[in-house]
Amino acid sequence: MLCLLEVFIIMSTSERVVQSILYELGCILIGCLVMHFVPHEGQPFVLMVIFSLLAMVWNFVFNWIFDKLVPGDRLARGPIIRTVHAVLFEGLFMIATVPIIMYMMQMSFWMAFMTDITMTLVILGYTYVYNWVYDRARLYFVEA
């Protein structure tokens, strides 16, 4: 029988894929809902699918580079390192996403920038809740 700590640490590759897919489906839905309140041209669903795919690739690349630059025990990373990680991840991602929003939704830079910030803040809250719920649900299903 696995101890509680092992249940939280050990995740198979297939479970990580399922976790990522479920997360990104939620992001697509939330992004489309946010876009409902923003004046735009274009297809928000297509934009959100593109962002979802970009985010998955960016997550892999960014975390690989970050882990090389900040080696050591990932569990020992404190709030400062985690904050730097999050700000760099989102800030660099926005460098790519703002021009895409401008082009696909036919928005000005300012409108695309504000839309991206809004989506980022909403997704930030979703990320917190999603991972909290997922970890608890996972514990229930893994122990079952």
Would you name each region that the model predicts?
Residues L4-A144:
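Juxtamembrane/disordered regions of integral membrane proteins
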